[in-house]
A protein has these predicted regions:
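Long, charged/polar, soluble alpha-helical segments
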Residues: 1-180
Length: 180
């Protein structure tokens, strides 16, 4: 997949996403917040792409897809599941410094977020299963991304951004407490 195709796919998928819970329900507010993040990052990705900022367009798309997929998993959103989408092509060499910086920043952010968050629900509740899935997804993203470095900064950025989107969605959904 090329960056332009990824951004286009994300925009189309985000545009079709709808709440899976009644708007007036107690869960409706969280569904709206998730969809707002998904929509905002789809818009940001399009603006970045329009201005030739491929690195930020890519990161915004993957991060937003993480939010979207987590929102679907949690049952707040009805949408197509994307999983993390890899690029088949490297970025232009003149963007490597920016790509490297962004990739390493997302790696640090994901590590920090994992270290600085704890499950909010009691381990005996059904919600705890969701916590485990979200943490597992974020930890797997960190591990896979680190294994890709330093050979594949592009797809390492994809998995770091995507995993960070999952974890952020879990935090916003009240499933994690921030400890540090």
């Amino acid at each position: 997949m090329l960056i332009e195709e990824l951004v286009s796919y994300y925009q189309k998928t985000a545009a079709k996403a709808v709440p899976a819970v009644p708007k007036a329900s107690i869960l409706g507010g969280t569904a709206d917040e998730i969809l707002e993040m998904v929509t905002c990052y789809a818009s940001d990705a399009a603006v970045f792409l329009k201005h030739g900022d491929l690195v930020n367009a890519f990161a915004a798309s993957e991060y937003g897809l993480g939010w979207l997929d987590c929102g679907v998993y949690l049952g707040y959103v009805n949408a197509e599941i994307s999983n993390c989408l890899a690029l088949e092509k490297e970025f232009p060499t003149d963007l490597f410094e920016k790509l490297e910086e962004k990739t390493l920043r997302y790696e640090r952010m994901l590590k920090g977020a994992l270290a600085g968050s704890v499950p909010a629900p009691d381990a005996e509740t059904g919600c705890y299963t969701a916590v485990e899935k979200i943490r597992e997804t974020a930890e797997r993203a960190l591990s896979v991304g680190e294994d890709m470095l330093p050979e594949d900064y592009v797809n390492a950025l994809a998995v770091f951004s995507y995993g960070y989107g999952w974890l952020d969605c879990g935090v916003r959904s009240g499933l994690f407490q921030i400890t540090g």
